[in-house]
Amino acid sequence: MPSQVMDQRHHMSQYSHPTLAASSFSEELRLPTERQVGFWKQESLPHHMGSKSVASSPIEKPQPIGTRMAGRLELLQPYKLRDQGAAFSLEHKLFGQERHANLPPSPWRPDQETGRQTDSSLKSAALFSDGRINPNGAYNENGLFSSSVSDIFDKKLRLTSKNGLVGQSIEKVDLNHVDDEPFELTEEIEAQIIGNLLPDDDDLLSGVVDEVGYPTNANNRDDADDDIFYTGGGMELETDENKKLQEFNGSANDGIGLLNGVLNGEHLYREQPSRTLFVRNINSNVEDSELKLLFEHFGDIRALYTACKHRGFVMISYYDIRSALNAKMELQNKALRRRKLDIHYSIPKDNPSEKDINQGTIVLFNVDLSLTNDDLHKIFGDYGEIKEIRDTPQKGHHKIIEFYDVRAAEAALRALNRNDIAGKKIKLETSRLGAARRLSQHMSSELCQEEFGVCKLGSPSTSSPPIASFGSTNLATITSTGHENGSIQGMHSGLQTSISQFRETSFPGLSSTIPQSLSTPIGISSGATHSNQAALGEISQSLGRMNGHMNYSFQGMSALHPHSLPEVHNGVNNGVPYNLNSMAQVVNGTNSRTAEAVDNRHLHKVGSGNLNGHSFDRAEGALGFSRSGSSSVRGHQLMWNNSSNFHHHPNSPVLWPSPGSFVNNVPSRSPAQMHGVPRAPSSHMIDNVLPMHHLHVGSAPAINPSLWDRRHGYAGELTEAPNFHPGSVGSMGFPGSPQLHSMELNNIYPQTGGNCMDPTVSPAQIGGPSPQQRGSMFHGRNPMVPLPSFDSPGERMRSRRNDSNGNQSDNKKQYELDVDRIVRGDDSRTTLMIKNIPNKYTSKMLLAAIDENHKGTYDFIYLPIDFKNKCNVGYAFINMTNPQHIIPFYQTFNGKKWEKFNSEKVASLAYARIQGKSALIAHFQNSSLMNEDKRCRPILFHSDGPNAGDQEPFPMGTNIRARSGRSRASSGEESHQDISITSVNCDTSTNGVDTTGPAKD
């Protein structure tokens, strides 16, 4: 019977077209849930029905509908007469394990392999379709894998005689050998055979995509290597970072390259050595001297920051980077006061102080090509040990010299700058830290943000130069050859092509609107660093050459990048206009169109991604900046919190390199219509400086009134932005920008001819910056750069208040009480403000608390009352008869809790703005407070004489003001002048800030 069955099946196969056999593999890799259990009808195998023959193999076993072993049914699929295209082939077993060798040897002999190779190749050709039935047997390669799987099987699955069962076709089996060794007829053996025939899913998939060897060796490999995505899927997981760098070229297929590459979410660069150590897990009881002694053992300490020691960390900065390396190596995990130190390198922020800018690296310009690195090493080595001398890519006349010690770099800079070496006058400049490292870190985030109007707030990129890369730029070309400074090599090649690909991919149809001379929308900027700019100089020439063309004609506000200043190209600022046509005329320098262009809202594109491709040196003389300054910007006029690097050169003429209609040829349009500043003599251009300190949304910088009293403005302004907060001057908007207030600049201060000042800025804050604080030029008619509004009106108001408080930090200090100064006699003020008084305290309660120890030491006291709720407003004023009385009074109350009402408030003392008894009387005697209940008035006491300490009536003025109609705290009805007494410190958190709210006065 077995021979009859097999013969019948053999005849069946002879009627089958080879393509039908091949198509039976089309669903070979379907998920296990798609195995169509119970699909087969019994009439598919008519010769099995009623058969009582001895089943010597699982193939001869009849299966009812709904059987629980799907694997048995799958073995029958190659012999199904109907639906040949959807059959599940016995060739499924090609992916089995070596356990197939456990099969009984007699039905399957090595000599039965005749003709197998051809048949196997035909069937494997259609093994992977696309998951669809292919009755014609046509080969389809758009399936689960895009690689040529047929080639894998043709080349890899050459089976030997050891794979008899899985290597040969059933129709080729010679059943003459069946009776040689009878087979046991038990369900257990049958199940074992079937189990051996069926590979599990892991074995199945691993045999397909390994491309390593025969599938019978799959169980000898590690499971981690069987990952389907390892080689077949193109998603390398857990691979080495260096390998990623080498294989990265061309791996990005989305047109943006590094945006979705290994830079996103991965630590491309490990911790880079730095001269500054960030030491965590510090015991707060450790003395500063102890820390200094510990770390000074490894070298001279440049700075020791211990203000956050109570929070568990300190920062130590060395002059020599080797000192930091040794300290980290020796002290890592060492115990200090029973705490193991956790030390990391700390890279200075992108807005470092002046001393942090020079990190031991200087850039050498105009080097004679005949000079070798050895020659330079001899010349510069006299000032200190040199760590490395690097060449600048594509700039043979530029060199980067890195010293171990920053003091050596400073000495070399001072001694050799502007000196002649090999017949050429060299130029030296400091280099900021980590140029190439920040290049790669910011590449993905800054690319689209800079050019296409996306500004992410609260990220590191908001204070860092924008860098970009496109397409298939090879990441391996961006290297970091030193511990702290990197160089950019070969980035220019292939970049333009990649950029055009990015433009076509990300913004279809946009290229037709871009002038041909505009090579790319890329933005590569630098914060006064030639280590970056020298390497990117050539890129700048091709990337940013505008040639009179404006940027993309995007309508609306330009992209804001905090900590950035606009760009100037041939005297005209590169920006995004509201009206591109009118602005194109402005770019051409047409004077008659200037006023129209300004009214069409030429918006300075602060921090835009444009590169004008010209060295800043070309305009240095015109802008009044000295070429001998400590830093300049090449190829890009962006200042990244580094405006202090420029030095004013008073002898330089203030001229633009091309006819600038904004500067010397201001049209006759009225200032109110221009929304700008009238024309001024060019000699005042540099001196009339507009500083911007701690700018917030809706705030304008502090202005020196003497500048405005001159009654002549200037077309371009210098602006320093050391703390340029996102959304600064966001309220200074224009019509057409829905996110901005439509407040006209000339309506704020009409006496200035259209100039703008923030009303919240008090005269006390007014002042001008030093020449070193003058940054890049804001070129345009509007003194304030219109920027997008990023926050709500509530946030804007809070920011304005915070801005006012922040700008008055110096004023706040003058109200602080310093006992030491009183003891020395340096401070003779006598009027104090007592803050954090419980609101339920009355004047009598307060007097009782004071008189316990200080009766007769004061002659004035006033506790303002809120007449609406009949409670005090939380503070009081007292005038001591002698400054020395303040010392015991301070010791009694300052920092102490109040006894009554179980209050948690802690009293604090500060000086009041109005000082002295007579000044206080003069302030209140004509106040509407005199119309209130006597219990709410200030209380006077005799200062001297026999009645010293006794209460005296408060003198009434002759011009007492009437009640204003709304409740106030001090009298309920005080005017602004009356309030000023309480406005010294009108709540418990501020000093010297005038506040006129009802609960504040």
Curated annotation (Swiss-Prot):
Give residue ranges for domain RRM: 275-348, 360-433
Q: Indicate the secretion signal residues.
A: none
| Record field: compositional bias (Basic and acidic residues) | 793-803
Keywords of the record, alphabetical order, are:
Repeat, RNA-binding
Q: Where is this region: Disordered?
A: 100-120, 767-815, 941-1001
Top-level taxonomic group: Eukaryota
Could you mention a single GO BP entry for this protein? Answer: positive regulation of meiotic nuclear division
Question: SUPFAM superfamilies under this entry?
Answer: RNA-binding domain, RBD (SSF54928)
Biased composition (Polar residues) is annotated at 978-994
Query: What InterPro entries does the entry give?
Result: MEI2-like_RRM1, MEI2-like_RRM3, Mei2-like_Rrm_C, Nucleotide-bd_a/b_plait_sf, RBD_domain_sf, RRM_dom
GO MF term list: RNA binding
Q: Which Pfam families match?
A: RRM_1, RRM_2
Physiological role: Probable RNA-binding protein that may play a role in growth regulation.
The molecule here is called: Protein MEI2-like 4
Origin species, per record, is Oryza sativa subsp. japonica
